Amino acid sequence: MSKSRAEAAAGAPGIVLRYLQEQNRPYSAQDVFGNLQKEHGLGKAAVVKALDQLAQQGKIKEKTYGKQKIYFADQDQFDTVSDADLHSLDASIMALTAKVQGLQQSCRHMEAELKELTSALTTPEMQTEIQELKKECARYTERLKNIKAATNHVTPEEKEKVYRERQKYCKEWRKRKRMTTELCDAILEGYPKSKKQFFEEVGIETDEDHNVTLPNP
């Protein structure tokens, strides 16, 4: 046996006794070994020996169930608890349980919000996306203008296709603008300055800044 293991074994009775008194619940030798092994480096033989020694000295109680022995602290050493104290503890437990449940629910809401925010576009990505959409919208607006001006060269089917595409991109424009607005609002909830200052700091330009109006459907 190594020196450190021997020292741990010598102090095992005190460690085991203190553990059983602090926990004040029944344990098997395997339970005590599993719970103390990592922190104190106790071997199973040392734990079993300490439990038997403490039981023989009357410092802990021992019960045999079939082939298994159960050990627990001597209850005579603890103060008697009144019914009023028990009821008070029950009330405290219920209050703390309700508080924990409320905190857990808040954590779930915050995790859901965080997941939504992390899956959304970043500010630079939004800026790039907005610029691309503006360019794309300008191209289609110009194309539509030319098509309207040259009705003799456009079939009804082509005209209908262009109108459908226009409706599609207008819908996408509204959708992305709404997403951007919601994301900015979520960020602004924890932002110490005004919305205008936030937009100036990150370089966000709105449709209104350029007098751009979303076309009618």
From Swiss-Prot:
GO terms for biological process: androgen receptor signaling pathway; estrogen receptor signaling pathway; homologous chromosome pairing at meiosis; meiotic joint molecule formation; meiotic strand invasion involved in reciprocal meiotic recombination; positive regulation of DNA-templated transcription; positive regulation of nuclear receptor-mediated glucocorticoid signaling pathway; progesterone receptor signaling pathway. It holds the Pfam family TBPIP. Residues 89-117 are annotated as: Interaction with NR3C1, homodimerization and transcriptional activation almost abolished when missing. It is found in: Nucleus. Its main location: nucleus. Residues 118-182 are annotated as: DNA-binding. Residues 118-182 are annotated as: Interaction with NR3C1 decreased when missing. Keywords: Coiled coil, DNA recombination, DNA-binding, Meiosis, Nucleus. Residues 93-153 form a coiled coil. GO terms for molecular function: DNA binding domain binding; double-stranded DNA binding; identical protein binding; nuclear estrogen receptor binding; nuclear glucocorticoid receptor binding; nuclear retinoid X receptor binding; nuclear thyroid hormone receptor binding; recombinase activator activity. Phosphorylated by PKA, PKC and MAPK. It comes from the Eukaryota. Disulfide bonds: none annotated. GO terms for cellular component: condensed nuclear chromosome; DNA recombinase auxiliary factor complex; nucleus. Plays an important role in meiotic recombination. Stimulates DMC1-mediated strand exchange required for pairing homologous chromosomes during meiosis. The complex PSMC3IP/MND1 binds DNA, stimulates the recombinase activity of DMC1 as well as DMC1 D-loop formation from double-strand DNA. This complex stabilizes presynaptic RAD51 and DMC1 filaments formed on single strand DNA to capture double-strand DNA. This complex stimulates both synaptic and presynaptic critical steps in RAD51 and DMC1-promoted homologous pairing. Forms a stable heterodimer with MND1. Interacts with PSMC3/TBP1. Interacts with the DNA-binding domain of the nuclear receptors NR3C1/GR, ESR2/ER-beta, THRB and RXRA. Belongs to the HOP2 family. This is Homologous-pairing protein 2 homolog. It comes from Rattus norvegicus (Rat). The lineage of its organism: Eukaryota, Metazoa, Chordata, Craniata, Vertebrata.
